[in-house]
């Protein structure tokens, strides 16, 4: 796609088509797989969760033109990914390849923490952070994830996911400004990698997928959850800026 501009427009749909086809074939002939989970895991790097979050942040800051443009781009990416997934499913069914979506047992809870460490290192590579910033990026990812999980656990009668995401965004926003104030480095070094595990890109992908599968009730429910999580995360970041304001604008 980098060397073929015309291919770049359809790259998201092609990636989804290939990933879904490979998953269905492997599940049908090699080993049973939880197809939806495997497809989502393979496409998660392309799901525009960060773009959706940035769009809501810009709209809430009254940058309406750039915010709506970013929102439109994110929605078009979601539609292309969903189209590729559904097209692959229909093509496999047309040639007689069908695979049941197996419900595999969940991994033990302790596996979350080694996976979190691996994800934090991967995010440092993904953001092309300088070597000196790697410890900060890794710590930010861990803090954001753990704050969100623990915030949801102590939410009581309140909805766990929105409360956890709000507290995670609040803590990361405040820590990013503290880092910018005292280390004289951009607060984005903490903020952007830290919220990457909090952005609801997978929720948006599932909402559009349910809609194209004509499951409108589940699509609407998931879409409302997407909006709730986006608002909670952006509100947390805004209140973090109010809690600790950066002394320097970097």
Regions found by a protein language model. Name each.
Residues 1-199, 207-250:
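Alpha-helical transmembrane segments and their membrane-interface boundaries
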């Amino acid at each position: 796609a980098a060397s073929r501009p015309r291919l770049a427009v359809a790259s998201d749909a092609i990636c989804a088509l290939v990933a879904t086809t490979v998953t269905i074939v492997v599940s049908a002939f090699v080993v049973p797989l939880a197809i939806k989970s495997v497809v989502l895991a393979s496409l998660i790097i392309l799901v525009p969760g960060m773009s959706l979050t940035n769009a809501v942040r810009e709209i809430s800051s009254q940058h309406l033109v750039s915010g709506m443009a970013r929102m439109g781009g994110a929605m078009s990416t979601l539609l292309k990914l969903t189209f590729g997934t559904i097209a692959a499913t229909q093509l496999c069914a047309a040639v007689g390849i069908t695979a049941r979506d197996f419900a595999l047992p969940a991994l033990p809870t302790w596996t979350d923490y080694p996976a979190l460490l691996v994800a934090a290192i991967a995010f440092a590579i993904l953001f092309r952070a300088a070597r000196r910033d790697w410890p900060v990026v890794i710590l930010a990812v861990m803090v954001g994830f753990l704050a969100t999980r623990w915030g949801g656990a102590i939410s009581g009668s309140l909805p766990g996911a929105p409360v956890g995401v709000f507290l995670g965004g609040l803590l990361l926003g405040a820590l990013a400004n503290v880092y910018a104030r005292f280390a004289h480095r951009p607060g984005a070094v903490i903020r952007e990698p830290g919220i990457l595990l909090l952005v609801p890109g997978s929720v948006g992908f599932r909402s559009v997928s349910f809609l194209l599968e004509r499951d409108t009730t589940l699509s609407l429910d998931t879409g409302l959850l997407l909006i709730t999580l986006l608002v909670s995360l952006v509100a947390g970041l805004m209140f973090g800026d109010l809690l600790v304001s950066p002394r320097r604008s970097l």
